[in-house]
């Protein structure tokens, strides 16, 4: 009857077909992942973090040897902008040389491969100029205390840049300051330049760095202007016994 006819209609699968159907029922959904712009090794992955760190330290050391405000320009009564540029251009030039030497070593000695080598180097020239301008202003405005501020700002940038782990895993304070510090944008842009990807963050970083550079130079010029104005306190400093 009906049961007999139904039993004859049950498909009789062979072992291979049974195994295939069992696998489908056991794992009905499969996830296929395809990495985009994957870094080939840890060195390439960490390069966007350590390259700007070295440029910041290089500018910091340069201003330990070069005064942030050119004394000769101050002495002859030059304009404040000329004084600021006279103190910034030598360190910016040193930053360009440092960038060229650093990337040559990373590429030919370490084996760093860059998806956009020319863009990476040009971008790092801007980074070196920006970092030099920021450090110049801190030293020109705050004197010896500026060196402490330079180190403090470096620590804040290292902990909020998201260079080692996603910044979202950091405490809320570092998430809050992340978008407002230049190194955050530098790290994000270098990832796109070294391993590939959308260039939107690169152009944003260029705009941010240009703004920081212009603002820092303007503040340095203001500090130079203040140095040119003599006050009673500067003419007659308090005596200390």
Language-model segments: which ranges?
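Membrane-spanning alpha-helical segments of multipass transporters and channels
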Residues: 2, 7-241
């Amino acid at each position: 009857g009906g049961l007999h006819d139904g039993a004859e209609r049950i498909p009789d699968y062979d072992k291979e077909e049974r195994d295939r159907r069992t696998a489908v029922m056991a794992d009905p959904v499969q996830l296929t992942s395809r990495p985009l712009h994957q870094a080939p090794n840890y060195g390439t992955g960490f390069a966007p973090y350590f390259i700007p760190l070295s440029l910041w330290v290089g500018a910091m050391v340069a201003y330990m040897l070069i005064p942030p405000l050119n004394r000769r320009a101050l002495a002859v009564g030059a304009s404040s902008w000329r004084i600021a540029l006279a103190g910034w251009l030598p360190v910016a030039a040193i930053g360009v040389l440092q960038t060229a030497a650093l990337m040559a070593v990373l590429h030919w000695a370490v084996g760093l491969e860059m998806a956009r080598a020319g863009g990476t180097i040009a971008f790092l020239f801007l980074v070196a100029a920006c970092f030099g301008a920021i450090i110049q202003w801190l030293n020109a405005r705050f004197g010896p205390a500026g060196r402490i501020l330079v180190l403090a700002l470096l620590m804040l940038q290292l902990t909020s840049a998201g260079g080692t782990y996603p910044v979202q895993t950091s405490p809320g304070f570092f998430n809050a300051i992340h978008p407002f510090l230049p190194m955050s944008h530098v790290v994000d842009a270098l990832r796109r330049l070294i391993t590939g990807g959308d260039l939107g963050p690169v152009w944003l970083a260029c705009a941010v760095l240009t703004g920081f550079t212009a603002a820092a130079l303007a503040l340095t010029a203001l500090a130079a202007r203040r140095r040119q104005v003599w006050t009673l306190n500067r003419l007659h400093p308090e005596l200390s016994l």
